[in-house]
């Protein structure tokens, strides 16, 4: 008897249940699938995921506030990624897609109830969360609408900028996405949450940097804009306003002092070198945009050479 066909049908039924916000029904169907084919890896993986979420749903009753319930789903989505890393099984995209729809649909329902209050329609955090939810359910046009509203209040926020960049990339607005990602990783690289990113533009860059540098966590985030420049991802640049240029130079001065004074084994010390290099790159890009004296460009390049000769050779 060929068990592949019925199990495939059961998997699809389980995923449809998840997308319809019925995780309990999905569990029942997946258990049936495993009875039909005990060795089916996708069914086993999917059941682990569904059970993980059903366990988390028990705690939802602890929250009386609608907004807190929506926030709980988003926080658990990030914890779910940690669970996936720990499980270490092969990931099955149809399952992860269904789980994503389940999570963000549920969160969106709670946030929409809160958004109905006119006073909340200008709350930048709520607008960001609604945008994230629409992205999670695959409605990129509405995600763009809310994220563009959120960015009006959070122009220098790495998380909001990166979410807006990600949605633009998913909508094939490549040039806008490149500019926004570059901005996000300059303004606040530690604010970018790679677990919520979906576009191949940023996921591909993440994978390349992880493979080449063997990095993760905060250090990975600091190196990504540098390799974004090397790999030709962050290629859309802009001229800085005078006040921005002044702030950039002040930040460079502070970072140079941090790099010189902090022992390499001190906590967070590894973050300062790549952050300083990225600031140098922004200064060089500005000089090139305004056709500044080539001597100033070369002077800044030599500063990069002093702190990281390998990066210097790759960008020179």
Please give the residue ranges for each predicted region.
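Alpha-helical segment of the N-proximal tetratricopeptide repeat
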Residues: 6-32, 76-103, 126-134
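Residue-level recognition of tetratricopeptide repeat
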Residues: 6, 23, 39-42, 123, ...
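Short, charge-rich amphipathic alpha-helical segments embedded
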Residues: 23-59, 152-160, 307-314
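Start-of-helix register in tetratricopeptide repeats
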Residues: 8-9, 42, 125, 132, ...
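Eukaryotic alpha-helical solenoid repeat scaffolds
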Residues: 83, 87, 91-119, 123, ...
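Residue at a conserved register position within TPR or TPR-like alpha-solenoid repeats
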Residues: 17, 50-51, 134, 168, ...
């Amino acid at each position: 008897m060929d068990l592949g066909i019925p199990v495939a049908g059961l998997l699809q039924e389980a995923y449809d249940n998840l997308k319809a916000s019925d995780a309990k029904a999905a569990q029942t169907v997946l258990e049936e699938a495993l009875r039909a084919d005990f060795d089916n890896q996708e069914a086993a993986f999917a059941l682990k995921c569904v059970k993980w979420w059903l366990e988390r749903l028990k705690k939802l009753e602890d929250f009386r506030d609608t907004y807190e319930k929506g926030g709980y789903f988003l926080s658990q989505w990030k914890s779910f990624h940690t669970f996936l890393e720990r499980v270490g099984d092969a990931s099955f995209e149809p399952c992860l897609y269904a789980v994503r729809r389940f999570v963000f649909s549920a969160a969106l329902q709670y946030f929409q109830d809160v958004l109905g209050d006119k006073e909340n329609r200008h709350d930048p955090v709520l607008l960001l969360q609604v945008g994230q939810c629409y992205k999670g359910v695959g409605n990129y046009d509405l995600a763009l609408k809310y994220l563009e509203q959120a960015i009006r209040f959070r122009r220098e926020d790495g998380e909001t900028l990166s979410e807006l960049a990600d949605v633009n990339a998913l909508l094939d607005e490549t040039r806008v996405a490149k500019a926004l990602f570059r901005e996000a990783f300059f303004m606040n690289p530690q604010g970018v949450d790679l677990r919520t990113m979906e576009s191949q533009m940023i996921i591909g860059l993440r994978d390349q940097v992880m493979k080449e540098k063997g990095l993760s966590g905060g250090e990975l985030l600091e190196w990504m804009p540098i390799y974004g420049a090397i790999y030709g991802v962050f290629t859309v640049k802009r001229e800085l306003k005078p006040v921005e240029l002044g702030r950039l130079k002040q930040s460079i001065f502070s970072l140079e002092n941090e790099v010189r004074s902090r022992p390499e084994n001190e906590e967070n010390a590894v973050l300062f070198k790549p952050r300083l290099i990225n600031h140098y790159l922004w200064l060089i890009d500005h000089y090139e945009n305004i056709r500044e004296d080539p001597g100033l460009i070369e002077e800044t390049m030599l500063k990069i050479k002093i702190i990281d000769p390998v990066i210097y050779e790759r960008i020179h």
